[in-house]
Amino acid sequence: AAKELILVNSIYPTRVADALLAKAKVGNGGAANFIIKYGLYRRLLGMRNAFSEADDLVMLDDLDACNNYELDLNDIKNAEIPISIILGSKDRLVDLKAVENFTDIVPSQTYTMDEVGHFSFFEDPVELSRLISKIV
């Protein structure tokens, strides 16, 4: 059984913007550029390599899955495990209103990493690891 739930640069519900979905319908490259533009705070060389260039529209599948995923927040609320949310202070992809709604319903602790965007695991992996170690 899980002992801790940690959401990193994520929240439920995750709603993907129509503009990003439109890019993903055309191809992975345009969606990747959008995510990097709005999600990345620190400039990282090679970041584009983290995204598929294939013609399989795998990003569209993933983004559609975010919008279509459903669960009952009361199930999470009653799970009786500690829940932590780790966000980047410069993340423009996570909906802060959704974070507020989630934390109003589900007992949880929110942590914010300074000067980090949506990709904390790339932008500041040492700080993210330190924070996760502190939580668990």
Regions found by a protein language model. Give the residues of each.
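Conserved alpha/beta-hydrolase catalytic His-Asp/Glu region
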Residues: 15-78
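Hydrophobic "lid"/C-terminal helical patch
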Residues: 63, 102, 128, 132, ...
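Hydrophobic/aromatic beta-strand patches that form the interior of the parallel beta-sheet core
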Residues: 6-8, 84-86, 111
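Conserved alpha/beta-hydrolase "acid-adjacent" motif
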Residues: 92-98
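Catalytic histidine-centered segment of alpha/beta-hydrolase-like enzymes
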Residues: 93, 113-129
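Conserved hydrolase catalytic core segment
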Residues: 1-16
